[in-house]
């Protein structure tokens, strides 16, 4: 899955590059993920190139924001960013590659899906995916770098919406309440019903629940 926004055109339809004021001369994209820890569902990553001419007030780490504020900021980012792309790695890819490599893959897809080619990717965390452009890992970047904050919001809101859709198919697990994380409610449902096709069988609690129903 990848959702990308085309750049807004300037004179003659040429894209207007967004420059990060903290990195003069660079076209910077912020990159973050959502869903490394859950027991179910894909891992989702987003890459965002903000437009300094259209600042977005209130950007922060998505985990520090209420769901209502995340939804509002999601709409603002989609409307005002110069470019964005949301991508994912599937449960099958997570189980095959492991969650770290699947996360790097989702991030790579998000950056490569941007309609504006950045010169620098600022990645939340302590490691970067393999990219064709320069990249910089920033621990806690989702609370420090606006473009990473924006990516964090797009990734989390998108993933939360995906899990709400999964809840419609598998209401017994309560995906709409915990987004696939290993809450007591989710673990109890796993023990009672066993895992579904959207559970990550490479994760120990899911593997244990699968063994119980064999």
Curated annotation (Swiss-Prot):
Endonuclease that specifically degrades the RNA of RNA-DNA hybrids. It catalyses: Endonucleolytic cleavage to 5'-phosphomonoester. Residues 26-214 form the RNase H type-2 domain. It is found in: Cytoplasm. This is Ribonuclease HII. The keyword Nucleotide-binding does not apply. Its cofactor is Mn(2+); Mg(2+). One of its GO terms (molecular function) is RNA-DNA hybrid ribonuclease activity. It is an enzyme of class 3 (hydrolase). A divalent metal cation binds at residues 32-33, 124. GO terms for biological process: DNA replication, removal of RNA primer; mismatch repair. Manganese or magnesium. Binds 1 divalent metal ion per monomer in the absence of substrate. May bind a second metal ion after substrate binding. It comes from the Bacteria. GO terms for cellular component: cytoplasm; ribonuclease H2 complex. Keywords: Cytoplasm, Endonuclease, Hydrolase, Manganese, Metal-binding, Nuclease. The keyword Nucleotide-binding does not apply.
């Amino acid at each position: 899955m990848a959702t990308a926004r085309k750049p807004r055109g300037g004179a003659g339809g040429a894209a207007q590059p967004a420059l990060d004021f903290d990195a003069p001369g660079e076209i910077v994209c912020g990159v973050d993920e959502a869903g490394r820890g859950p027991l179910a569902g894909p891992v989702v990553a987003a890459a965002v190139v903000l437009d300094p001419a259209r600042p977005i007030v209130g950007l922060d780490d998505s985990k520090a924001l209420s769901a209502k504020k995340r939804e509002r900021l999601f709409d603002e980012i989609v409307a005002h960013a110069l470019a964005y792309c949301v991508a994912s790695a599937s449960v099958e890819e997570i189980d095959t590659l492991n969650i770290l490599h699947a996360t790097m893959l989702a991030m790579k897809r998000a950056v490569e899906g941007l309609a504006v080619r950045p010169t620098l990717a600022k990645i939340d965390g302590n490691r970067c995916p393999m990219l064709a452009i320069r990249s910089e890992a920033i621990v806690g970047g989702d609370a420090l770098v606006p473009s990473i904050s924006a990516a964090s919001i797009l990734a989390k809101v998108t993933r939360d919406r995906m899990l709400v859709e999964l809840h419609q198919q598998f209401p017994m697990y309560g995906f709409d309440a915990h987004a696939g994380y290993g809450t007591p409610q989710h673990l109890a449902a796993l023990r009672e019903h066993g895992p579904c096709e959207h559970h990550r069988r490479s994760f120990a609690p899911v593997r244990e629940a699968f063994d119980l129903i064999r």
